[in-house]
Amino acid sequence: MAAREELYSKVTPRRDRLQRPGTVKHGSALDVLLSMGFPRARAQKALASTGGRSVQAACDWLFSHVGDPFLDDPLPREYVLYLRPTGPLAQKLSDFWQQSKQICGKNKAHNIFPHITLCQFFMCEDSKVDALGEALQTTVSRWKCKFSAPLPLELYTSSNFIGLFVKEDSAEVLKKFAADFAAEAASKTEVHVEPHKKQLHVTLAYHFQASHLPTLEKLAQNIDVKLGCDWVATIFSRDIRFANHETLQVIYPYSPQNDDELELVPGDFIFMSPMEQTSTSEGWIYGTSLTTGCSGLLPENYITKADECSTWIFHGSYSILNTVSSSSLAFGDGALERRQYEDQGLGETTPLTIICQPMQPLRVNSQPGPQKRCLFVCRHGERMDVVFGKYWLSQCFDAKGRYIRTNLNMPHSLPQRSGGFRDYEKDAPITVFGCMQARLVGEALLESNTVIDHVYCSPSLRCVQTAHNILKGLQQDNHLKIRVEPGLFEWTKWVAGSTLPAWIPPSELAAANLSVDTTYRPHIPVSKLAISESYDTYINRSFQVTKEIISECKSKGNNILIVAHASSLEACTCQLQGLSPQNSKDFVQMVRKIPYLGFCSCEELGETGIWQLTDPPILPLTHGPTGGFNWRETLLQE
């Protein structure tokens, strides 16, 4: 609040400004902001952070960043010079971007719009951004008639890269243009710009699965590089503090429940550093808002991954080929260029969309002859402690330990625990919606004619309940029994305190009408689990118990379902595929992206003992959250 008062205190009252002679009415955006009483450094930072779009945009930025602890930090932004295509070729590249993502999934090239890199990222002080634009304008005017039209491009493919390379003669001209810009920028702004020294190209795809190469190559061959195209030299900037962060976009609103939480507004972007996630709770991440500059904890299911360039700021551009006067494309006032880019759909952030590809259901028993064995691994459903908070027990248990349902998403009843209701603190059940999620998955398996022969699950109650409801959806709850396997429990390092949860024994689970096999002898009993085990121990335990489960079921049915934790989808399948486990930091980041009822399918390759991930026989399950609602607090007037 102090920061807010300080910002407002520096704005001269309106009546005083109107009476003061010499008030700037038609000056530059900076002059107008200064006349409004904003400090010069803040005004320059606001203009740089909004691309000099307008005084209004700069004012909005300043007021939204009142609580930004780095508002007065002199750290400059990072800038880059790209060539971007416009016209028919740009549309063709846009089509390739969309088709390749839809058919083969996202690869690294999708993080940034189609472009040719002319220089490395460089820093420029906020006060010198206008001069940087002048440097680009001067350079373009000198080189305007020296470029080939159309720019000659050649398709190149390798095992993990596809691109359009600029032919050597034209590439040399572009490199000299970039070097001239670097010299002009150094002269006008004293910044150091390093021209791109590698072969100039438009990246179409890289870091993709080898199996996708033929499809991507065929799509790339459909791009007619001789189509009409104007290329524009464009400057973008980004906040240097978040250069190595993951970019996320908010899809649902969230109002903070605690002081360390971040308010979420749909459409805002969040920067997340993997290094800052080591101490966060399951289901939460720590991030920084683009709109406010504030940092805090936020629920991970309220956001989705966004392209790296989604938060970049467009500063202006000039055509290097056509004869339009540069004055019509004024630097720092990029409305025309911005509209052109939005019309092309390049680099913009699209609204949340679910694209369902035609999927052939896995009909396991529809073909005669030997069948391939399949392993399905599924995460549990929505859990009570995540939805209702760490102290959820106080909301639904009275002083005598009696369960009282206080929300429609709470189950009608809970199993009795021999150790008392406090055992639920470390072993929470799933919600009503969690049960519904699980039944939906079971019904989808039934509709796809997928037969499940064996079901194993972690001893966590949320996993047992999820497995039971999947069987209900499959209409197999009276025929199949769940084998509770402690070896499938998640990484014990994530368990709070010095003891493991006091899980409900199989006999008591069965007494609570859950379809549990009370005769099953686990491969890894509870006594063999160690608290705070190492990452290697957890990965090896998961792999070992999965191998033993597969061996146990051989010749007794082809399909095994494991219901466990988000980490299980990776830990139980990685080494089955002959792959080495990833490091613990990457593992943790991957696990955060697996939602409730996340489902994967692994198929054995003949009798080789090697398995591979395949398309699941069911569609994915996506849903949005619903925040708490109290009609008295919201509707009742004082």
Swiss-Prot record:
> Keyword Cytoplasm on this protein?
yes
Residues recorded with modification Phosphothreonine: T12
For this protein, the record's SMART domains field holds: SH3, UBA
- SUPFAM superfamilies in UniProt: Phosphoglycerate mutase-like, SH3-domain, UBA-like
Residues covered by the UBA domain: 23-65
Null allele phenotype? Mice display strikingly elevated levels of tyrosine phosphorylated, ubiquitinated proteins following TCR stimulation. They are prothrombotic and have shorter bleeding times, which is attributed to insufficient SYK dephosphorylation in platelets.
BP term (GO), one: negative regulation of bone resorption
Cellular component aspect of the GO annotation: cytoplasm; nucleus
Compartment(s) of residence? Cytoplasm; Nucleus
The alphabetized UniProt keywords are:
Cytoplasm, Hydrolase, Nucleus, Phosphoprotein, Protein phosphatase, SH3 domain
Q: Which reaction does it catalyse?
A: O-phospho-L-tyrosyl-[protein] + H2O = L-tyrosyl-[protein] + phosphate
What is the tissue specificity? Detected in splenic T-cells and B-cells, total spleen, skeletal muscle, heart, lung, kidney, thymus, brain and liver (at protein level). Highly expressed in brain. Detected in heart, spleen, lung, liver, kidney and testis.
Which residue ranges are recorded for the region named Protein tyrosine phosphatase? 369-638
Which InterPro entries does the UniProt record give? His_Pase_superF_clade-1, His_PPase_superfam, Phosphatase_SH3-domain, SH3-like_dom_sf, SH3_domain, UBA, UBA-like_sf, UBASH3B_SH3
User: In the UniProt entry, which residues are flagged as the active site?
Assistant: R379, H380 (tele-phosphohistidine intermediate), H565
Enzyme Commission numbers on file:
3.1.3.48
- Which positions bear Phosphoserine? S9
Enzyme class of the recorded protein, top EC level: hydrolase
Q: Which coarse location class describes where this protein primarily resides? A: cytoplasm
Q: How does it assemble?
A: Homodimer. Interacts with JAK2 (in vitro). Interacts with CBL. Part of a complex containing CBL and activated EGFR. Interacts with ubiquitin and with mono-ubiquitinated proteins. Interacts with ZAP70 (ubiquitinated form).
Q: What role does this protein play?
A: Interferes with CBL-mediated down-regulation and degradation of receptor-type tyrosine kinases. Promotes accumulation of activated target receptors, such as T-cell receptors and EGFR, on the cell surface. Exhibits tyrosine phosphatase activity toward several substrates including EGFR, FAK, SYK, and ZAP70. Down-regulates proteins that are dually modified by both protein tyrosine phosphorylation and ubiquitination.
- PANTHER family found in the cross-reference section: UBIQUITIN-ASSOCIATED AND SH3 DOMAIN-CONTAINING BA-RELATED, UBIQUITIN-ASSOCIATED AND SH3 DOMAIN-CONTAINING PROTEIN B
**Name of the protein:** Ubiquitin-associated and SH3 domain-containing protein B
What organism is this sequence from?
Answer: Mus musculus (Mouse)
Q: What is the lineage of its organism?
A: Eukaryota, Metazoa, Chordata, Craniata, Vertebrata
What gene codes for this chain? Answer: Ubash3b
